[in-house]
From Swiss-Prot:
Signal peptide: none
Entry-linked PROSITE patterns: CB, TYR_RECOMBINASE
Entries under SUPFAM superfamilies matching the protein: DNA breaking-rejoining enzymes (SSF56349)
Name of the protein in question: Prophage ps2 probable integrase
Stated family: Belongs to the 'phage' integrase family.
Gene3D superfamilies: 1.10.150.130, Intergrase catalytic core
Recorded GO MF terms: DNA binding
Coiled coil regions, renumbered to chain: none
Keywords: DNA integration, DNA recombination, DNA-binding, Viral genome integration, Virus entry into host cell
Active site: R209, K242, H326, R329, H352, Y363
Stretches assigned to the Tyr recombinase domain: 170-376
Any one of the GO BP annotations: viral genome integration into host DNA
PANTHER family for the chain: PROPHAGE INTEGRASE, PROPHAGE INTEGRASE INTS-RELATED
Gene name of the encoded protein: ps201
Amino acid sequence: MWIENLPNGKYKYFERYRDPLTEKLKKVSVTLDKKTPRAQKVAQAELLEKIESKINNSSTSNAKFTDIAEEWWSFYKKSIKQSSISALQSSFNFIIDYFDKEIKISNVTSKVIQKFINDADCPRSKLERSKSTLNLIFDYAVDLEYIEYNPARKAKLPKKIQTVKDLEKIQNKYLEQNELKALLSELYSRPNTRRLALLAEFMSLNGCRMGEAIALKKENYKRSERKIDIHGTLDKTVGYSKGVKTTPKTASSFRTVDLSDREIEILDEIIEQNNLSKSVINDYNEMGYIFVSKRGIPLQTNSFNLAIKRANSRLKSPINKNLSSHIFRHTLISYLAENNVPLKAIVDRVGHKDGGKTTTAIYTHVTENMKSSIIDILNKKN
C-alpha cells in the first residue's frame, strides 16, 4: 500500500492486485481525511474489501458458454417478433449443439470460433446467421462483463466466390416482364384466382412484402393523396383468422409510398369485391383488411404460393423459377433498375434497410447486363 497527499489536504491510499481475468496488475484506492496509523489500518481493510469484490466479479470468467448463450437467448427473444425467433432458433440450436457444454466462455477464443466456422457443414445462409448470432451472444457477454472483448468479431467467414450458378440464382429471384404478364394473365383468367391475381400484380408494382400487403387496411389507403401507408405486417403465427397486425420487419419498412394509376385501380377493385362479398355472405368476417378472401380472411401465403405454382404449370411455357410471393417484390426491383431508377429510390420504396442484400444483388446484376446495351446504342449512332 502507498499513500499520496491530495491538494485538498486529504490522503489517497492505493493498493495493487492482479486481475485473474486479464492477469494484469490493477489498482484500487480509497480517500481518507487522516494519515494516522489508525487511518492506515482502516484504509488497508477497505482496500482489501475492494480487491476481494473486484476478484469475485472477475470470477464470472468461469461461467460456461452455453449458460451465457441460453441467458442471452432468453433476453433477446423478448425484443424480436415470433417470426424472427422461429428463423433464428435453428442457428441458435446449431451453435449450442457444437460447443462443449462445459467450456468456459473465457476459453472460447477467436480461434475456437474460427474452427466452428471452418467445420460447419451447412448452407452459406445458415452459416452467416450463426456467425451473426455468435456476435450477439458475445456482445451480450461483454456488456455484462463476463469477458472483456468479443472474440467472434475477429473470426471471419470464407469469402464467397460468385459462380455461374450464383448468377443464375439472382436471375431466378425475379420475373422478366413477359413472364410476369403470362403468369398474371393466367391468374386473372379464372374467377377463383382473381383476388390472388390482384394481390400479385399489386406487389409487382408496389414492392411490398406479402405480409405487408395483407396487413393493409382501408384506413391506410389515402386515395385522394395517391398514397398508401405500409405500417405493419400480419402476424401469421397466431393464425390468419385472428388478423393480428404487428410492427414491420425493420424501421425502414415503416413507410408511406406513392401509388401508380394501376395500383389505385387494383385497390378500388378489391375493395369493391369485398363490399359485395360482405353484402351477400352472412358469415363474412369484417376485419378492415383489403387483400382478403371472399369471407374476409386475409389471403394466406401458403395458399397464394400454391396457386401461382399451379397457374404456372398451366402455361404453355412454364417459368423455370422457384415461384413464391417474394418474386413479385423482386420483379419490381429489377424493372426499376432496368429503367435507371437509382438504388436509393428503390430501397426507399421497398423498405429495405441499408440497401438490402437481395435488392443490391438484383440491382447490380441488372445494371451490369445493361452495359451491353451501351455498345448497341453507340453502334446505332454510326
